[in-house]
UniProtKB/Swiss-Prot annotation:
Keywords: Aromatic hydrocarbons catabolism, NAD, Oxidoreductase. Belongs to the short-chain dehydrogenases/reductases (SDR) family. Its EC number is 1.3.1.119. InterPro entries: BphB-like_SDR, BphB_TodD, NAD(P)-bd_dom_sf, Sc_DH/Rdtase_CS, SDR_fam. GO terms for biological process: catabolic process. Pathway: Aromatic compound metabolism. Can transform various dihydrodiols of chlorobenzenes and chlorotoluenes into the respective catechols. It comes from Cupriavidus sp. (strain PS12). This is Chlorobenzene dihydrodiol dehydrogenase.
């Protein structure tokens, strides 16, 4: 068990990638507090993991919600070793030209309030407890933090901002607290919702044929599931193996940045030599 005795707080842990992180952390011996807006999602986690988890229903746009989550975490488990800022929303690749003039300010505010301010508020609330435990913070970025097309103009700008947040907090908090990011690519079965201000709140990535869209253009040849991404969050939360690791963002997106000009990858050519 790689996280035995550790305590984590996961925002947006009620479903999707966040839920997979919670499940994996518990399997690795950690106890986990989960901040999520879905009471039903939190109840499912409680039934699955029992006393190893504590759920806090709240809004990641509220500092009070984050403070309550940290307080409940420390009250229940005695400490906080690792903050995972993960709650998110997507713009379904909405381009700037398609955002109406009378909705752009509201859409910007909604996006950045969740994926940027929400992380900053989580960090602010968790700082005293993380300082005490000499722990770490991990923020979910995205391949959109590195490349265009992983979202629209709002999501891509927001995820680039998260990379800046990771680097700045690593500078401000080192050497007392480590801060890193993890940038997944497409997630098979993800249920991340769209911006309400753009009328996308009922859409989920789960309805998109991601395997067909992305699999052929990735060097890995397939789209990973949330469970397959969760292992990276375990590694970043370990203490003994990550002593020099801070201010880093792990780009874990199936090799999107090393695609060839004409083919995604050339590994199939090895078959004629070794198959």
């Amino acid at each position: 068990m790689k996280l035995k005795g550790e305590v984590a707080l996961v925002t947006g842990g009620g479903a999707g990638l966040g839920r997979a992180i919670v499940d994996r952390y518990v399997a690795e011996g950690a106890r986990v507090a989960v901040l999520d807006k879905s009471a039903a999602g939190l109840e499912e986690i409680r039934k699955r993991h029992g006393d190893a988890v504590v759920g806090i229903e709240g809004d990641v746009r509220s500092l009070d919600s984050h403070r309550e989550a940290v307080a409940r975490c420390v009250e229940t488990f005695g400490k906080l070793d690792c903050l995972i800022g993960n709650a998110g929303v997507w713009d379904y690749q909405t381009q700037l030209a398609d955002i109406p003039d009378n909705g752009i300010s509201e859409a910007f505010d909604e996006m950045f309030a969740i994926i940027v301010k929400g992380y900053i508020l989580a960090a602010k609330a968790a700082l005293p407890a993380l300082y005490k435990s000499k722990g770490s913070a991990i923020f979910t970025v995205s391949n959109a933090g590195f490349y265009p097309g992983g979202g629209g103009v709002l999501y891509t700008a927001g995820k680039h901002a998260v990379i800046g947040l990771v680097k700045q907090l690593a500078h401000e908090w080192g050497p007392r607290i480590r801060v890193n990011g993890i940038a997944p690519g497409g997630i098979l079965g993800s249920d991340i919702r769209g911006l309400k201000t753009l009328g996308l709140q009922d859409q989920t990535i789960a309805t998109m044929p991601l395997a067909d869209m992305l699999g052929p253009v990735l060097p890995t040849g397939r789209v990973a599931t949330a469970e397959e991404y969760a292992g990276a969050y375990v590694f970043f939360a370990t203490r003994a193996d990550t002593v020099p690791l801070t201010g880093s963002v792990l780009n874990i997106d199936g090799g999107m940045g090393v695609r060839g000009l004409f083919e995604a990858s050339l590994g199939a050519q090895l078959d004629k030599h070794f198959a």
